[in-house]
């Protein structure tokens, strides 16, 4: 199983874009060349601010949604310190309950 990653890209106007991928470098290059998300086209210089492995696609999608709900200040703390990322991931991992 290919691991999925959560990443944040900083635009020239200091905004943070959140996404998921199986190959961070490839996806970053796509964004830089204008072939990635429309939200990043024409935003000037892009820098990869943060990336971390999150597990499978399902967990990556949930992590992406949760990070997109964070305030700018919380995202900046995540970028600077990785603050709270482990807790965020563990809160998303729900144990599978076997039903009888």
UniProtKB/Swiss-Prot annotation:
GIY-YIG domain segment(s): 2-77
Organism domain of life: Bacteria
InterPro entries linked: GIY-YIG_endonuc, GIY-YIG_endonuc_sf, UPF0213_domain, UPF0213_GIY-YIG_endonuc
Pfam families recorded: GIY-YIG
SUPFAM superfamilies, per database record: GIY-YIG endonuclease
Gene3D superfamilies noted in UniProt: GIY-YIG endonuclease
HAMAP family in the cross-refs: UPF0213
Family statement drawn from the similarity comment of this UniProt entry: Belongs to the UPF0213 family.
Protein name per the record: UPF0213 protein YhbQ
Source organism of this protein record: Escherichia coli O17:K52:H18 (strain UMN026 / ExPEC)
